[in-house]
Amino acid sequence: MLSSAYPLFRIFPPPRFLIAPAVGLTVSDHSIRFAELARAGRFLTLERFGEMDIPDGAFARGRMKNREAFKTALSEFRKKYRLHEAHIALPDEESYLFHTKNKGLPRRDIRARLLEEIEQNVPLPLNEVLFDYQLARDESGEMSITVFPEKTIEEYLSIFHESGFSPLSFELEAHALARALVSPREDGAIMIINIGKTRTDLSVV
């Protein structure tokens, strides 16, 4: 997860009653959607859900095509549902996603390996990208690496701030779906099919 939150909170998380509620938010070519979960004992339940259409041509294939129209839509959406903090799922089109192995690699050397892999797999200079990675839970040593152009993340961060949102994190849409739908105990290959209004995305996890 590409997080904009201060890393101290990862080490010393504040008490739950001090944490402002945050929603999950995603943007497609034609609409903005959010969902808010609530804990019920050991389970999570859907507390709220909302959706709003955005003007044609304002957003397409992961990019803002009409910035002012998109900002207006985001602002109206935030006010309509009284939203503020949000975890934002990023469309896959602007990302580079690949896997590599790190079995037997000391943890202190992981970053250097990641930078080598990014140089080999991403047609952008290292100083122009932001990346995140996930280690497999098993002993395979497999790493999943997600890379975005830094300019793309800055554009998203700017437009959401200007629209009144406080982005807490950015995450690839495919990763967000996998975390929501696939059990951590699942050790087989799973195909996730995300059917939208004008496109269908497939991902294998």
Named regions from a protein language model:
Residues 2-53, 86-89, 182-205:
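Gly/Thr-rich phosphate-binding beta-strand-loop-beta motif of the actin/hexokinase/Hsp70
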Residues 29, 47, 65-72, 105, ...:
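Generic alpha-helix structural propensity
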Residues 32, 54-59, 93-95:
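Short active-site-proximal "capping" loops at secondary-structure junctions
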Residues 42, 58-69, 136-140, 182-188:
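Short, glycine- and charge-enriched coil/turn segments that flank and shape catalytic ligand pockets
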Residues 44, 60-62, 95-99:
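Switch/connector loops and helix/strand junctions flanking conserved nucleotide-binding motifs
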Residues 48-78:
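N-terminal phosphate-binding loop and adjacent alpha-helix
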Residues 81:
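Active-site charged/polar residues at nucleotide-handling catalytic sites that mediate phosphoryl
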Residues 85-184:
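Active-site neighborhood for divalent-cation/phosphate handling
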